Amino acid sequence: MKKFLDLGLQPLANKYLTRKDLRKKRKEQFYHLEVGFDNKTKLVSILNKVPSQKMFDNSYPYRSSMSKTMQKSFKELAKHIKLKMRPKKILEIGSNDGSFLKNFKKSMSIGIEPCANVEKITKKQNFNTIAKYWDTKLAKNILKKHGNFDLIYSANTISHIKDLNDVFKSIDLVLSKNGTFILEDPSLIECLKRNTYDQFYNEHIYVFSYLSLSNILKKFNLEIYKIENLDIHGGSNRYFIKRMDNKIKIEKSVIKQKKEETKYGLNKKNTYFKFTKRVQESKQKLISIFKYCKSKNKKIIGYGATAKSTTILNYCNINDQTIDYFLDTTKDKQNKYTPGTKIKINQYKGGIKEDVDYVFLGAWNFKKEIFKKEKKYIKAGGKFIIHTPYPKII
């Protein structure tokens, strides 16, 4: 694995600080965030991997139900699954608060969610969920109790698991002979095109391309037969995966994706060093925008204290001296402080205040949804600061 990007020391992206933490001057854990490329497998990965138990525990704050965009995406996919695939049993790996599972009968679905605080939400709604990490031991227990599954779904989860061989070995155990595994994760080619280096943080161990994922799947006699390109999370791919002996035809979308990635150079290390140069330029430009705004005594706040924004803030050294506070709709983040940079997170109560001159868009991947919500602020002349595809004020 050849290192191509160094994002410096980074705190755990979802470990938000409390007032008590600040008062007692609790020492945060920082990890050197470096990203590498494996020329043999074409896999892109962070190099210093943090143990899962430190990241996904009883304080995990992310809720997929907080985004209308995510809710809509889950609903549309569920509709397609019901009409075209008609599975009898569904397993979701990384079920979070049940935003996908709620579209199916509880009797036919099982969710895996290791964060007990989030898993409790689905348990209260009588979903069949298991608060454990996905591995072969759990897969064997599920197989023994529930048998095989016609459909396995996982969104923004597989890239969080260190041992990919164990992940796909476990999938192989529980996927039925003619079943489909749908894997949804950020797209590497879109990450490079849009210069979204904040796709890299402690939890995002991998950012997949078709080229890298297909190489891994071969080991387990699995292959991708269809790919959907999504705009979610700043550009994602939805991979439809089957067993190699399943006679479903491989669709044109797979050939198209392979050609696009090869043409862009995702199979060449030089492509990643060029990306690094753009990231460094992006950092300097973003810092200069903030300096300019502060020199004019302008008030800047943040919108969406996301895990992604943790990478940007710490890499660019943007703290509470620059951003007054963040607004966020997630209850478990409110009245806390951003990891590393200690910016206060306030509850979003419906609309940006008139005295705010600039808003740094931490949740840039939901830009359309946010701009629609903040029409009044924009109409009154309010401005946003974004970093992708390059830093600018809009």
List the predicted regions and their residue ranges:
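Conserved class I S-adenosyl-L-methionine
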Residues: 86-96, 300-303
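N-terminal juxtadomain amphipathic helix
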Residues: 1-68, 228
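A short glycine-rich, Lys/Arg-flanked "PGG" loop and its adjoining helix->strand segment in the class I
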Residues: 165-180, 374-379
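Conserved SAM-binding loop of SAM-dependent methyltransferases across substrates and taxa
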Residues: 97-107
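A conserved beta-strand element that flanks and buttresses the S-adenosyl-L-methionine
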Residues: 153
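Flexible, glycine-/basic-rich loop-and-beta segments that form/coincide
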Residues: 234-278
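Short, glycine-/aromatic-enriched active-site segment of Class I SAM-dependent methyltransferases
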Residues: 183-206, 210-213
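Conserved beta-strand signature within the Rossmann-like core of class I S-adenosyl-L-methionine
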Residues: 178-186, 382-390
